[in-house]
């Protein structure tokens, strides 16, 4: 039992144990004492908790137009996708503010499915939305998930990532955003229900249904598999926004067949070459996703479907140079800190974009290409005080010549050529 005084008979704080001589004030209660320092600490904790609650009431959710304007600062192109996402996100958090029901009208969740090729900006759009709204954000890879009881991750581990992103504040996590990538990889192998167990396909879709719709999920705090003798974190997924993304390679022929089979007369079919193949993805319908291998219930949990276009050469050049976090701007800023001006020639940027298209990596491949080009520059220039300007040329990108370096007096020098052993 805690003693309220020490050997000398002095009163002590019941919380920190300091005597009345060690603190400025000791407040007495029924059989308990608390010092001014503990009162101050408790006040700070309570204010912090209340502050978090106010922050997550979402009274000032940005309007769809404002959301798209901020997305424009970080993501190039994809205007239709931005518009769809802005409206869906605005409606989702408006629904949270209203308490899901308005005059007996129940507002359903607006989870989102993004379809687009690798490197088209799906993950970046989801990350930027979370940053705009200042909510916890987690990314999960659908390919690592398996049905409960099999080797792999349980779907509840997705929720654990969100809880960790919210510093284990479950209330904050319950209003966060989860992006599930590679969702097309959990399509079942055929359109027909499988007799055999499909633990990483249809089984995962079934497991995801409840958390997408809204349920009280039990999450193991350390991750991994559940077992009966461990504690769980309870989290309500009703107000978590789920954004699923995937390339859906192979869905174009399904869309093309549907569009080409418009019956004329007594069952004659249109020539399938009449179908415009350029923007097939934008014409996707739930029935195409069903044929691809998503189960009807899973498609129903993702009411907002938006598509992203493949990035062309000019879009990739814009991605390199225009956004706030453009990689060229980042390298220019880093070299500026060393007193060096960095310049990319237009032809060099165009060649970098062409390489990314050839590799079929989209915007994702731009960073690795630039980092390969800039490695020697970033290694050597900080040690050279005679360089004022560094120019990346077409030949630099092609690997035939090193970057052009210019001294403070205007004379041109070159980095030493590397010779292979």
Curated annotation (Swiss-Prot):
One term of GO molecular function: protein dimerization activity
UniProt KW keywords: ATP-binding, Chaperone, Metal-binding, Nucleotide-binding, Zinc
Any single GO CC term annotated in Swiss-Prot or TrEMBL for this entry: HslUV protease complex
ClpX-type ZB domain segment(s): 1-54
Positions bound to Zn(2+): 13, 16, 35, 38
GO BP annotations listed: cell division; proteolysis involved in protein catabolic process
Stored InterPro entries: AAA+_ATPase, ATP-dep_Clp_protease_ClpX, ATPase_AAA_core, Clp_ATPase_C, Clp_protease_ATP-bd_su_ClpX, ClpX_bact, P-loop_NTPase, Znf_CppX_C4
Residues the record lists as binding ATP: 117-124
SMART domains: AAA, ClpB_D2-small, zf-C4_ClpX
Subunit structure: Component of the ClpX-ClpP complex. Forms a hexameric ring that, in the presence of ATP, binds to fourteen ClpP subunits assembled into a disk-like structure with a central cavity, resembling the structure of eukaryotic proteasomes.
Family: Belongs to the ClpX chaperone family.
Function: ATP-dependent specificity component of the Clp protease. It directs the protease to specific substrates. Can perform chaperone functions in the absence of ClpP.
The name this protein goes by in its record: ATP-dependent Clp protease ATP-binding subunit ClpX
Organism of derivation: Geobacillus kaustophilus (strain HTA426)
Gene name as annotated: clpX
């Amino acid at each position: 039992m805690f003693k309220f005084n020490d050997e000398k008979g002095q009163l002590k704080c019941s919380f920190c144990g300091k005597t009345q001589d060690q603190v400025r004030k000791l407040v007495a209660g029924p059989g308990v004492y608390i010092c001014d320092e503990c009162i101050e600490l408790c006040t700070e904790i309570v204010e912090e908790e209340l502050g978090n609650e106010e922050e997550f009431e979402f009274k000032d959710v940005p309007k769809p137009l404002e959301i798209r304007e901020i997305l424009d600062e970080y993501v190039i192109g994809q205007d239709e996708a931005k518009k769809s996402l802005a409206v869906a996100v605005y409606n989702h958090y408006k629904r949270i503010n209203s308490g899901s029901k308005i005059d007996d009208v129940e507002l359903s969740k607006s989870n989102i499915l993004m379809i687009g090729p690798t490197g088209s900006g799906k993950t970046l759009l989801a990350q930027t939305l979370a940053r705009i709204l200042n909510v916890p954000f987690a990314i999960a890879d659908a390919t690592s998930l398996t049905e409960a009881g099999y080797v792999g991750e349980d779907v509840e581990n997705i929720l654990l990532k969100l809880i960790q992103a919210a510093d284990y504040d479950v209330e904050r996590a319950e209003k966060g955003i989860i992006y599930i990538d590679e969702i097309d990889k959990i399509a079942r192998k055929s359109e027909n229900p499988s007799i055999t167990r499909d633990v990483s396909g249809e089984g995962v879709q079934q497991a995801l249904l409840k958390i997408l719709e809204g349920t009280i999920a039990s999450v193991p705090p350390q991750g991994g598999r559940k077992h009966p003798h461990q504690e769980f974190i309870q989290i309500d997924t009703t107000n978590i926004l789920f954004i699923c993304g995937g390339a859906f390679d192979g869905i174009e022929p399904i869309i093309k067949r549907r569009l080409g089979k418009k019956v004329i007369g007594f069952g004659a079919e249109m020539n399938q070459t009449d179908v415009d193949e350029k923007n097939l993805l934008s014409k996707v319908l739930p029935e195409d996703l069903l044929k691809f291998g998503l189960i009807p219930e899973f498609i129903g949990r993702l009411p907002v479907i938006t598509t992203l276009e493949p990035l062309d050469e000019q879009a990739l050049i814009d991605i390199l140079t225009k956004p706030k976090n453009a990689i060229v701007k980042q390298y220019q800023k880093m070299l500026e800190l060393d007193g060096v001006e960095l310049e990319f020639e237009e032809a060099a940027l165009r060649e970098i974009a062409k390489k990314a298209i050839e590799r079929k990596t989209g915007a994702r491949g731009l960073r690795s290409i630039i980092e390969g080009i800039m490695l020697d520059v970033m290694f050597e220039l900080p040690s050279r005080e005679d360089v004022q300007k560094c120019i990346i040329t077409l030949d630099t990108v092609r690997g035939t010549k090193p970057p052009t370096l210019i001294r403070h007096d205007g004379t041109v020098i070159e980095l030493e050529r590397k010779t292979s052993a």
